[in-house]
A protein has these predicted regions:
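Extended beta-strand/beta-hairpin segments
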Residues: 1-48, 59-96
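Alpha-helical metal-binding/catalytic segments enriched in His/Glu/Asp
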Residues: 53-54
Length: 96
């Protein structure tokens, strides 16, 4: 069974649904790529997924080794490049 079901809503927007929970996320193309920039862009979600995965893995390791792991966050900077348009760099800074 699929994990995520995504549908195109038109106007460069999509809706991704986590099938098991029913939680939904809307994406919108950014202003600099013909969108309205009213929601996460697909590449924003990619970088958010990376940082969420990193913090989750750190949390699992901390729990496994009885290390306090609270009030931890990170800032993510996504740097786009052209020709072809793509994510060129992702910078993750942890606040611990």
């Amino acid at each position: 069974m699929e994990t995520i079901r995504t549908k195109y809503l038109g106007g460069l927007r999509t809706e991704a649904e986590h099938v098991k929970s029913g939680q939904k996320v809307i994406t919108d193309a950014p202003l600099d790529n013909q969108g309205k920039g009213e929601a996460f862009s697909p590449s924003d979600l990619m970088t958010a997924s990376l940082s969420s995965c990193m913090l989750t893995i750190m949390g699992i390791a901390a729990r496994t080794h009885d290390i306090p792991f609270e009030n931890i966050s990170c800032k993510v900077t996504k740097i786009m490049v052209a020709n072809p348009r793509r994510v060129g760099e992702i910078v993750v800074e942890f606040d611990m």
